[in-house]
A protein has these predicted regions:
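Residues within the alpha-helical elements of helix-turn-helix
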Residues: 14-15, 28
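Substrate-binding cleft of carbohydrate-active enzyme catalytic domains
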Residues: 20, 25-158
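Residues that mark the N-terminal boundary/hinge immediately upstream of a DNA-recognition element
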Residues: 7, 18-21
């Protein structure tokens, strides 16, 4: 942890990691049986690349504001050949740097109405393809992007996007190609994603926000100092109650390949805050992944929790001590 923290400090100073530093991180993780999987979130969540290369966006401008910790509503243009050539090169380079079999391409929170719907290039593409909705452009967009992943012998991962705020995935992406692994994350919509992926044969990773988002505060009053958009509270006990199979039969959850805790960094100042937010809830998520609900025991978990937390603190790792359950252990 200290070594990774040093890397992060250097990254903030130099604004990037070299390929050699990245290789060292990957090796450090591999020695601890951790696989590092890269993610490129497209076509939304692209404010960083659009700040550097604004011509890739639907705004068709040469300058864009540089915004830190915000996603804004910017998106890549679906009808711009430079977008595809740039990302083909990026995916090729990432494939050579990361030994993982997977590359995550995102696909979530695409604000299509403010971009592709109003973009003259995208509208021309819609007309050519006979599409009625701009969200249908996700079909050719991801067809090409997924092919770039596959031509590098990698397996693509996408977020399972079903929220009505954004064009739901079943408007344009279901059935996903069967070799695409999906991640369920939208709070309250996991059962729908679980059923759709079972029906269409996609491997599924479970990371529902109401249980597995480690950037959410652990207790009321423990909200981050900045970039807090009104996050809900996810207590340790709530994380421990996570049932990855959501009560369905073993057969209907057989396509679930694991669980994932997500720790988004826009409200995380440093490595100490990161580990503070992750632990002890990461212990609860781990147990959710390897222990069936019928064998889960909250009282047993609490008894096993404190020795592990004590051991981490002795090693200088910042953790949150769950004082609210201390008198009940």
């Amino acid at each position: 942890t200290k070594k990774i923290g040093a890397f992060l400090k250097q990254c903030r100073k130099e604004k990037n990691l070299t390929q050699e530093q990245l290789a060292e991180i990957i090796q450090y993780a591999a020695q601890r049986n951790i696989e590092v999987i890269p993610e490129l979130d497209i076509p939304g969540h692209t404010v960083a690349i659009l700040a550097a290369y604004p011509e890739l966006g639907c705004t068709h401008t040469d300058t864009l504001p540089k915004i830190v910790g915000k996603t804004t509503d910017l998106m890549l243009c679906a009808n711009n050949e430079k977008v595809y050539s740039v990302y083909q090169d990026i995916i090729k380079e990432i494939s050579s740097l990361f030994p993982s079999d997977y590359i995550h391409l995102g696909g979530d929170e695409a604000v299509i109405e403010k971009n592709w719907t109003q973009c003259s290039r995208c509208q021309a593409m819609m007309k050519k393809l006979g599409y009625q909705k701009a969200s249908q452009l996700m079909i050719p967009f991801f067809s090409r992007m997924l092919s770039f992943v596959q031509e590098n012998n990698k397996t693509p991962i996408l977020w399972c996007e079903l929220d009505n705020i954004y064009p739901p995935a079943n408007d344009y992406l279901f059935p996903y190609p069967k070799n695409v692994t999906l991640v369920s994350w939208r709070g309250g919509l996991t059962p729908t994603c679980l059923e759709l992926t079972r029906k269409h044969g996609n491997p599924l990773i479970m990371a529902p926000g109401e249980y597995a988002y480690l950037d959410y505060p652990q207790l009321k009053g423990d909200f981050p100092e900045f970039n807090n958009w009104g996050m809900p509270v996810t207590t340790l006990e709530k994380s421990y109650q996570f049932d990855p199979g959501y009560g369905v039969s073993a057969e209907d959850q057989a396509h679930i390949i694991g669980v994932m805790g997500t720790l988004w960094g826009e409200a995380i100042r440093d490595i100490n805050r990161a580990t503070y937010m992750a632990y002890p809830r990461a212990f609860a998520l781990a147990e959710a992944g390897w222990t069936q609900m019928k064998h889960r025991n909250w009282e047993s978990f609490k008894q096993r929790l404190y020795p592990n937390l004590t051991n981490m603190m002795k090693k200088g790792v910042s953790v949150r001590v769950p004082f609210e359950i201390a008198d009940k252990k």
